[in-house]
Curated annotation (Swiss-Prot):
One of the primary rRNA binding proteins, it binds directly to 16S rRNA where it nucleates assembly of the body of the 30S subunit. This is Small ribosomal subunit protein uS4. It comes from the Bacteria. One of its GO terms (biological process) is translation. SMART domains: Ribosomal_S4, S4.
Amino acid sequence: MSKYIGPDCRLCRREGMKLFLKGDRCYTEKCAFAKRPYPPGQHGQERKKLSEYGMQLREKQKVKRIYGVLETQFRRYFEMAEKMKGIAGENLLSLLERRLDNVVYRLGFASSRGEARVLVSHAHFKVNGKTVNIPSYLVDVGDVIEVKEKSKSKPRFIEIKEKYAKRPSPKWLEKDAENLVGKVIALPTREDIDMPIKEHLIVELYSK
């Protein structure tokens, strides 16, 4: 599947929920989903009843879009999840949460996962003292994530510190908002993921 390059707000409308892809805009009256909470297109308001396969596919697409992952990589995460101890669906979500771009977002060091992905790619972050510019890098317990010292003085990071860094982070992360430093103190569990995701549908889809 190729990368989607259209408006992010159309994806929220397609999935029938806010995916929080646009940062601040998602919390304002400008949010397209808040104005039109139905799929885009001429017949968008005429929601059709999905088949079992349709519901499974829709759930997979939703999760891929939340985390900004394409099909090949998403399938690879699922294969990893199946080999891990525990429940495959919950393992899958835990792996996605451990992506560096997601962790940066969860720490409040970016307004959205999309911005976090860009900032990581532009080498603004260190993990355990070393620069990491791979958004899909999987963090582990004990890892320390920080904004590079020379990046902290950039206007965008000054704004991030003022607007986002002090927002609450999940319990598996701890942070020093003043210095833009975070640490992984546990692996994320299903209870830590507050989004309405039906991961069992994804497991059923890939198990066919």
